[in-house]
Amino acid sequence: MKTARRRSRELAVQAVYQSLINRTAAPEIAKNIREMSDFAKADEELFNKLFFGTQTNAADYIQKIRPLLDRDEKDLNPIERAVLLTACHELSAMPETPYPVIINEAIEVTKTFGGTDGHKFVNGILDKLAAQIRPDEPKRR
């Protein structure tokens, strides 16, 4: 059974994905997500922080992610891009969540929505990103 926090992360990634694909305004996307039947199982506060925070800072997050990629960021699968952006926000703005939890959750969300080996790609990028964003925390491994 998925936790409310996992469901919030999944919904936030779906919302970011919609914004990447449809270019719909964030409030409209959030409204549509909240109307989904299983939104009641999510942590609404976490969803709001993840989705709106990612939307607000997406350009900055792309700048952090771009040097770590082995391809042009425009060639990223939209699901992988949405997962990376959302996890980058969580790493950057939510220090109360340990980075291994953020990476693991991103891997699980990618397994749910992404391609066959997308989770391996996401894991590699987020591991490097965590070392940059939280330089003191990864030393505690």
Curated annotation (Swiss-Prot):
GO molecular function: RNA binding
Keyword Transcription regulation included in the entry's annotation: yes
Keywords, in A-Z order: RNA-binding, Transcription, Transcription antitermination, Transcription regulation
Signal peptide extent: none
Xref: Gene3D superfamilies: NusB-like (1.10.940.10)
GO annotation terms (biological process): DNA-templated transcription termination; transcription antitermination
GO CC terms in record: cytosol
InterPro entries, A to Z: NusB-like_sf (IPR035926), NusB_fam (IPR011605), NusB_RsmB_TIM44 (IPR006027)
Tree of life domain: Bacteria
Summary of the function given for this chain in its UniProt record: Involved in transcription antitermination. Required for transcription of ribosomal RNA (rRNA) genes. Binds specifically to the boxA antiterminator sequence of the ribosomal RNA (rrn) operons.
Family from the record: Belongs to the NusB family.
Name of protein: Transcription antitermination protein NusB
Organism: Neisseria gonorrhoeae (strain ATCC 700825 / FA 1090)
Taxonomic lineage: Bacteria, Pseudomonadati, Pseudomonadota, Betaproteobacteria, Neisseriales
Gene from which this protein is expressed: nusB
